[in-house]
């Protein structure tokens, strides 16, 4: 049975984690996916940057404490100004009920992030002020250090990424079923081969349902006991041939490989 890591008092920012007030519809199919139930993934955030006096969605992320968001290192450009949208469902509605925008204090990119090889694709955003939790804004659970999920374990990727390769960005939050692909399979020659490291986790690859551009940094949500959810992955990369390419599952940064690093950064 998979345990929920509380990380002592650090990650215990709420009485519970990974427990949405509004449960997701798990029959839904990001590319090939469907609209999520509003606020059913309440730790999902929209990372936005400012250009020409307009805030634009660039990546997803997961709220892991009231002050910290987990995202991908490749989402971060030190020349940009960011804000974090929490409690969001429809990105076209600025003043959406139950949502807030948080300013950013500090961004911690993994010290060994490799932009060429996409190793250590993880970052933590510290918010300028703690956010108030509600039915629409909650913290995610994260797994125990080094825990692994078996092949075909049913997880869900969520985000506002492109609805299909080179297509439009989604207006409302999407979700898609992405079963885990074990490392042995994902590292086969005709899959991802040596590009996939053991600090990564693959999911999907059926050629139908997939994450896409704009989903980067967002969570791979996996069910555990008592109806709770853990974020086991951070959307990192996919195939240059298209977002839903057969035998090219989405590759996620495996959160359980970085628990010690996460704990270190959120104590700063």
UniProtKB/Swiss-Prot annotation:
InterPro entries: Peptidase_S1_Elastase_sf, Peptidase_S1_PA, Peptidase_S1_PA_chymotrypsin, Peptidase_S1A, Trypsin_dom, TRYPSIN_HIS, TRYPSIN_SER
Function, in words: Regulates activation and degradation of trypsinogens and procarboxypeptidases by targeting specific cleavage sites within their zymogen precursors. Has chymotrypsin-type protease activity and hypocalcemic activity. Cleaves TRY4 and TRY5 and thereby inhibits their autoactivation.
Key words of the record: Disulfide bond, Glycoprotein, Hydrolase, Protease, Serine protease, Signal, Zymogen
Domain Peptidase S1 as annotated: residue spans: 30-267
SMART domains assigned to the protein according to its UniProt record, in alphabetical order: Tryp_SPc
TM region(s), chain numbering: none
Catalyzed chemical reaction(s): Preferential cleavage: Leu-|-Xaa, Tyr-|-Xaa, Phe-|-Xaa, Met-|-Xaa, Trp-|-Xaa, Gln-|-Xaa, Asn-|-Xaa
Encoding gene (name): Ctrc
Chain positions listed as propeptide in the UniProt record: 17-29
Stored Gene3D superfamilies: Trypsin-like serine proteases
Source organism of the structure: Mus musculus
First-level EC class: hydrolase
Protein family (similarity comment): Belongs to the peptidase S1 family. Elastase subfamily.
Disulfide bonds: 17-141, 59-75, 155-222, 186-202, 212-243
GO molecular function, one term: peptidase activity
Active site (UniProt): 74, 121, 216
Signal sequence region: 1-16
E.C. code: 3.4.21.2
GO biological process, one term: proteolysis
Glycosylation sites: 25, 79, 90, 182
Identification of the protein by name: Chymotrypsin-C
